[in-house]
Amino acid sequence: MKEYNIVITGVGGQGILTAANLLGWAALRAGYKVRVGEVHGMSQRFGSVIAYVRFGEDVYGAMVPEGKADVILSFEPVEALRYINYLKKGGLVFTNARPIPPVQVSMGLASYPSMEEIRKIVEEDFGGKFLAFDAEKLAIEAGNVITTNVVLIGALTQTPGFPLSAEHVKEVIRISVPPKAVDVNMRAFELGVKAAKEMLNL
């Protein structure tokens, strides 16, 4: 595989950079060349955050070029649209369905699009595929809302064409999180896997 490009986005405090590092380490363990990049200075709580994970046999820069992302993994629906120009034709937008309305929406200066409007933009305007589910709800079910990022990663491992096995990713999570947090993260991962299988009829 020449290269596989992931753009991860959301708002500060959602664990985006942790997710990027977990996927990067998993790709490294799978034997790929890996580059992980992030946009600095934007990870204050509720500010927009973007990280890049690139891996394959032929990967050089850390930044994913526009129009080259195989997947946009978004922790917040509108954040997926903010960075939609990164998506390649036929790429996948996979998002947590739980919105965190931006300040402009809270102040009544803008309206928040419906999930159907977001889907339409992804599919019709950008020729992409769109999947959304409430990852936050599953993280709470697993035992801790901060594992939302792990729920999303678990789900991502089941999407068609994703090159990393669930086992590679789980291995990295086991050695990366504090020992007392391993069980809750494993539960979160498996709930994500299950949700994706149900959505994709696997």
UniProtKB/Swiss-Prot annotation:
Molecular function GO labels: indolepyruvate ferredoxin oxidoreductase activity
EC number: 1.2.7.8
InterPro entries cross-referenced by the UniProt entry: Indolepyruvate_Fd_OxRdtase_bsu, IorB_Oxidoreductase, Pyrv/ketoisovalerate_OxRed_cat, Pyrv_flavodox_OxRed_cen
Iron found in the keyword field: no
UniProt xrefs under NCBIfam families: IOR_beta, PRK06853.1-6
Subunit note: Heterodimer of the IorA and IorB subunits.
Designated name of the protein: Indolepyruvate oxidoreductase subunit IorB
Organism: Pyrococcus abyssi (strain GE5 / Orsay)
